[in-house]
Amino acid sequence: MSESISHQLQLIRRGCQELLIEEEFAQKLAQGRPLRVKAGFDPTAPDLHLGHTVLLNKLRQLQDLGHHILFLIGDFTGMIGDPSGKSATRPPLTREQITQNADTYASQVFKILKPEQTEVVFNSSWMDKFSAADVIRLAATYTVARMLERDDFSKRYHENRPIAIHEFLYPLVQGYDSVALKADLELGGTDQKFNLLVGRELQKHYGQPPQCILTMPLLEGLDGIQKMSKSLNNYVGINESPAEIFGKLMSVSDTLMWRYIELLSFESLETVRQWQNEVESGCNPREIKMRFAREIVARFHSQTDAVRAAEEFEARFSKGVIPDDIPEKKLYIQDAGLALPQLLKLAGLTASTSEALRMIEQGGVKLNGDKVSDKTRIIPSNVTVIAQIGKRKFAKVTLVTEQSGKQAN
């Protein structure tokens, strides 16, 4: 194996879970041509978070090595709904929902990928042309027994929970995408391994060289336990403000910090090892976290924004200064005042009044910079207060008496 190929393999392996089959992949690299690298995204959610960028970062790395990215937006498969890892049938999206969500992708992914080395494709381009007979022929390539080898299907089957026939079609359609695109390599999360292997088998069935497979781990959310997800509110959105991204990354544990650096940082392995040595020699992990947070903010905004976010963070948390860019909220009320727990909920600082009460009990609530311990406190109408939850959540709230009888909103 040449030194060039060994170097590529070393870079590509970084942070990945599994590379199948590595010997075949080395042979593809030895051909000396740009490989066709496929990654599919079902447009079920229009906003990307850092968990999505684990895969995008690896695609960018492959671009830097000279390879061609096939960024597949699964507008057709999105109407089926990916059952991977799901314990129940997932409701499909409408064509209108999918089109709307897909339109938001380009402006986000090209913050990471090089447009000139990226081909955006939609699997409806070939799947819309499939007849009923074509679908039946595709379904005939796999057995129900093979489908039940998937953990999620097997679990539901043995627990007597329903599996719809259309769910078996999802991995087949995703696999056929590899046939249509003549993919050399497909990337996916660890939960996608079965689907990726189906693509490899279908390519063999249709007389093509089988793709290799690169699986990437699922990034843990800010809680360090469950995978990053908007629904779990443990995510960092790439379109969030510089201050919000910076603050969220600074909130992760010192242990989770290294996991994030491994999967999200573009710094070299040598630099990361140097950082680890610094911490072992007594450097505060917070300093490393600051460097990493600046890198991520600069990637999705600018270097100037990263410096400003770091300065604001230092001022806000080290010196107790309230930031200037506080979101403003006007609440219309019928009465002469509003109970503090309700204000916190309506301002979007807590998900419920019970959470607000709990935060007050824990001493995590401030009004105009002063800690509040009175759970029954009433904020009078026609005043403006700066409400704060913890270290990162602020809102400038104005209460207005609504003469027309409109409720607080």
Curated annotation (Swiss-Prot):
- GO biological process, alphabetically ordered: tyrosyl-tRNA aminoacylation
Would you tell me the protein name for this molecule?
Tyrosine--tRNA ligase
Query: NCBIfam families attached here?
Result: tyrS (TIGR00234)
Q: Does this UniProt record's set of keywords contain Cytoplasm?
A: yes
EC id: 6.1.1.1
- Principal EC category: ligase
Which positions are annotated as binding ATP? 230
Q: Which GO terms describe its cellular component?
A: cytosol
Reactions the enzyme catalyzes: tRNA(Tyr) + L-tyrosine + ATP = L-tyrosyl-tRNA(Tyr) + AMP + diphosphate + H(+)
Motif 'HIGH' region extends across 43-52
* Keywords assigned by UniProt, alphabetized: Aminoacyl-tRNA synthetase, ATP-binding, Cytoplasm, Ligase, Nucleotide-binding, Protein biosynthesis, RNA-binding
Per the Swiss-Prot or TrEMBL record, what residue ranges does the short sequence motif 'KMSKS' region cover? 227-231
What is the annotated quaternary arrangement, including any partners?
Homodimer.
Its biological function? Catalyzes the attachment of tyrosine to tRNA(Tyr) in a two-step reaction: tyrosine is first activated by ATP to form Tyr-AMP and then transferred to the acceptor end of tRNA(Tyr).
Family classification: Belongs to the class-I aminoacyl-tRNA synthetase family. TyrS type 2 subfamily.
Q: Name one Pfam family in it.
A: S4
Sequence ranges assigned to domain S4 RNA-binding in this UniProt record: 338-399
InterPro entries documented for this protein: aa-tRNA-synth_I_CS (IPR001412), aa-tRNA-synth_Ic (IPR002305), Rossmann-like_a/b/a_fold (IPR014729), S4_RNA-bd (IPR002942), S4_RNA-bd_sf (IPR036986), Tyr-tRNA-ligase (IPR002307), Tyr-tRNA-ligase_bac-type (IPR024088), Tyr-tRNA-ligase_bac_2 (IPR024108)
Q: Which Gene3D superfamilies match?
A: HUPs (3.40.50.620), RNA-binding S4 domain (3.10.290.10), Tyrosyl-Transfer RNA Synthetase (1.10.240.10)
Q: Does the keyword Aminoacyl-tRNA synthetase apply?
A: yes
Q: Which domain of life is it from?
A: Bacteria
The record's GO molecular-function terms, alphabetically, read: ATP binding; RNA binding; tyrosine-tRNA ligase activity
Where in or outside the cell?
A: Cytoplasm
